[in-house]
Amino acid sequence: MKKAISFLVCTVLLFSSAAAEQTVVLPEGRYVIDVPDDLKYSPAEEVDEGIEAYISDTLEMDYCSYPATEDAPILQERAEKLAADGTDAEMRTVNGIEMLVYRVTDEADGAPCIGYAFMDGTQTIEIFFWYATQEAADLTRHIMETIRENNS
């Protein structure tokens, strides 16, 4: 019974924090996602041109998105290489968009991270979510399930 109540409380908190959302245009402008209002825009440093970062003190997660380098490998090849290296990686289709989803540990601070990579024309777009709890990790999936073409 305790587990059921804990699950219910966590679910309510998760959905209440995700209820108020803002739409964010991803790099290159073709796609958008909805992120919780608790994620606040963090201006990029001049050297980080192209990076869009959002941080939160309450959600126990941060995220950034950016266009990858021109010579980024084909997603399927990259998924196979990551899997061969022991990384939890898979190809997934979300709202008609094929993307690579993988879990890594940030080398700089040891934080767990979920990465998403997908093609926007000839450009690869990378999105990384750093998270501190499983609830925050689950929220990344909810956020990515909102991806859609930018119709504005």
Identify the meaning behind each predicted range.
Residues D37-E46, K81-T93, N150:
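Short secondary-structure junctions
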Residues P27-I74, V104-G110:
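Secretory pathway targeting signatures of secreted, lumenal, and periplasmic proteins
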Residues D34-D38, I55-L59, N95-I97, A117-I125:
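Short, solvent-exposed coil/turn segments at beta-strand boundaries
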Residues Y31, D37-K40, I127-S152:
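Surface-exposed amphipathic alpha-helical segments
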Residues A79-T122, W130:
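Signature of long, low-cysteine stretches enriched in small and polar/charged residues
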Residues V9, L13-S17:
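Hydrophobic core
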Residues K2-C10:
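Sec-dependent signal peptide recognition
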Residues A20-T23, D48-G50, V94-R103:
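Short, hydrophobic/aromatic-rich segments at coil-to-beta transitions
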